[in-house]
Amino acid sequence: MTLTIITINYNNAEGLRKTLASVASQTYADIEHVIVDGGSTDESVEIIREYARANGAHAGSLTNNCHQIHWLSEPDNGIYHAMNKGIRMATGEYCQFLNSGDLLLNPNVTQQMIEHMDQINAQREEPIGVMYGNMKKVMPDGKILHDACNGGHDVTLEMFYRGCLNHSPAYIARALFQKYGMYDESLRICSDWKFYMQSLVLGDESVEYVNVDVTLFDMTGISETNKNLLNKERNQLLEELIPQGILKDYHAYHFPMDQYRRLKRFHLWGLVHFIERVLFKLEKWHILR
């Protein structure tokens, strides 16, 4: 099975160098690496060409450790425009997005994930739609946090109301882009959320979690402005995708569900349950009087 790893880059030469090296180190041979550069003015293009020259390949395509790498460098209209270019160039059955600065955590991780994929698909009539693992996040203060995302729980509307599946450790069937369309280029930050919502929640496509640490994701570029824009776009998309009758009920029930999760996280649910039972008995006693 061919996995297409798509890397988006713009003026991040050092990050690109590290990303290329992490992909080149993979022991799994059947990797197609598509690099979409947005017309960088730093050393990015020269770094790609160095790899090409080192492997005796012509510009635009190179072979590294049995991996096919195809690339282009031209201006784009934003990250989702660039990602869609990468999807159009892809020929693998599954796509993984690993942007410049992001790393695969060890040389065997792709092999591990493909083995899990083969085991899952061997038990199914149709190939899995999305398979995802864990990622580690490098925070702006240098701390590294472990993120299992949904951690194997059901992928539901409620989950997408408060978050999204992580992108870099996900293997997405290329057939889903053919079925649901590619990323919405009118959005600046939330198009992957929209695609997941349409395919996994509304389209009920299959999804599987594998407890493997797959990628190291650089969070240093995530600003408060980006977070605010994400919330704005997400709310707009909820209005666009979810019928109003369902959405109104969901808004009404989301707050108590969120509070319930917080209480469980801090091990206070037992106390709340005790108080609830006391109030129930008092209410029952009052009715019987």
Language-model features and meaning:
Residues 1-227:
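Nucleotide-sugar donor-binding/catalytic module of glycosyltransferases
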Residues 21, 88, 235, 239, ...:
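A short, amphipathic alpha-helical segment
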Residues 110, 200-204, 222-223, 238-241, ...:
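Short amphipathic alpha-helical patches
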Residues 212-213, 217-220, 224-250:
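Catalytic core of nucleotide-sugar-dependent glycosyltransferases
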Residues 243-244, 249-289:
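Membrane-proximal basic amphipathic "stem/tether" segments
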